């Protein structure tokens, strides 16, 4: 029967809509949708298709699940369809967590659950894209100066606010951005415990997090001065904002000064404050 078939194919809540409807069998493409659901669930502690329509159902039986997850799947944050928004008091996790994350992550979820539903062959977010976005999210973390909880750097929100990083999502204290470094298209927040890896500074070593190449460190005699320590085996070349050039040998540091440019081999990183 239908329930038996679904039980063999997977759990409806985490299956691609075309599999729930019975139009397709599990495949690489349907697995990509399931991966997106799992990542959304992990970060939002909520299901991307469970909103007002799910809340209106009294008994979540097989026909109801087939409707929500298969025949009429609507993303709870679809920018063009508000018919399935999260319901306060029922879907509070989705409402709380969605606003915490930066726009680039929200955008990829929107793509995964709009185009990824309407165009399964071309709209799904691939695993390699998720890897890049998860690293980008990790690099965007910075800490609230009041409660020390993690917040996220969002360049879009920063531009829209005229450079104001806003308030901490947890304690509502005013946030202060730490120094950051731009390497190519990537931006990494330079917190007290930040480390840069080969992935960040060498395009030939994507996803290489085997050992750090740089680490934020405090000046040994002046705790108010922070720097980036070379913990690799290679020499760096630093150009200050004033134009002076110096070498930074392994185990030496460069101050986190506005406009300083660090040449890590072929890659160049610029310090922003």
Regions found by a protein language model. Name each.
Residues 4-23:
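Conserved activation segment of eukaryotic-like protein kinases, specifically the C-terminal portion
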Residues 27-33, 39-106:
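Conserved C-lobe activation region of Hanks-type protein kinase-like domains
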Residues 108-141:
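Terminal C-lobe "cap" of eukaryotic-type protein kinase domains
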Residues 144-147, 165-171:
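Short cysteine-rich clusters marking metal-coordination/redox-active sites
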Residues 168-180:
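Short Cys/His-rich micro-motifs in 6-15 aa windows
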Residues 177-221:
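N-terminal beta-hairpin/loop module of FHA
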Residues 228-232:
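Asparagine-centered strand-capping/turn motif at beta-strand->loop junctions
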Residues 239-273:
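C-terminal boundary/linker segments immediately following FHA domains
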